[in-house]
Amino acid sequence: MQSIYLAKIREQNPLIHNITNIVAANFSANGLLALGASPLMSANVEEMQEVPKISQALVINIGTLIGKDREAMLQAGKTANEVGIPVVLDPVGVGATSYRRETVRQLLAEVKFTLIRGNAGELAAIAGEAWQAKGVDAGKGEVDLKAVAEKVAQRYGCTALISGAVDIVSDGTQTATIHNGTPLFPKVTASGCLLSAVCAAFLAVSEGNYFSATLEACVAYTIAGERAAQSLTTQVGQFQIRLLDELAALSPETIRQRGRINE
């Protein structure tokens, strides 16, 4: 595929505001730095009318909802909408508890999201489809995942990304599948959360071309995973470090040569 946005990230160094979970914060911040973006990891509700105004994109990740997180997410999302920056929702484990479901319901009702990214179980839950999720893991189900992505995108007027062995990107009118990646991704906690942050960096420099930016973000990230996993089998610790190295080493030429997409 043609790489449009990676070079822009390195040139512009966009500031990405992350309200993320305690498991993912360090990995997401380092991943953004490796890619060429700048992370800002603030969840203090008292700052949420200011921080989005100096940022180029916002990530809302519900992985470990504690204290005033929901209030902070709602305020940050509304401020981001006011200033017109892209907003990414990562609805971690949305189907696991009633509190998570209600949090996501309220977020979707009060904040306009640019991208909703999650695993199959999370996006199926948002679409109202039957799915046997396992906590925050994807679980199993029989639904047509392309149809799920399209349904979520159409319902919320956004781009939807279902990540898994095959990644699916849809904006409700166009849908693509990505066939890069590695089985080691699910072995490293927060690898999906980092993907959401990476998507935000690409969206930040996309000038409104959200489908193509999400597509390139996912291709770039999964190629980095492929390259990091070379010669590794069960060495998940080495994979995590190598993934950061490969994000830093990514080039537009690598994306063009290695991207495997069906549109």
From Swiss-Prot:
UniProt xrefs under InterPro entries: Hyethyz_kinase, Ribokinase-like
Cofactor names: Mg(2+)
Keywords of the record: ATP-binding, Kinase, Magnesium, Metal-binding, Nucleotide-binding, Thiamine biosynthesis, Transferase
Record's keyword annotation contains Transferase: yes
Binding site for ATP: 117, 163
A molecular function GO annotation: magnesium ion binding
Enzyme Commission code(s) on record: 2.7.1.50
Binding-site residues for substrate, renumbered to this chain: 41, 190
Transmembrane residue ranges: none
Involved pathway(s): Cofactor biosynthesis; thiamine diphosphate biosynthesis; 4-methyl-5-(2-phosphoethyl)-thiazole from 5-(2-hydroxyethyl)-4-methylthiazole: step 1/1
Signal peptide: none
Cited Gene3D superfamilies: 3.40.1190.20
EC class of the enzyme, as a word: transferase
One Pfam family per UniProt: HK
HAMAP family: Thz_kinase
Family statement drawn from the similarity comment of this UniProt entry: Belongs to the Thz kinase family.
Function: Catalyzes the phosphorylation of the hydroxyl group of 4-methyl-5-beta-hydroxyethylthiazole (THZ).
Protein name stated in the entry: Hydroxyethylthiazole kinase
Organism expressing this protein natively: Haemophilus influenzae (strain PittEE)
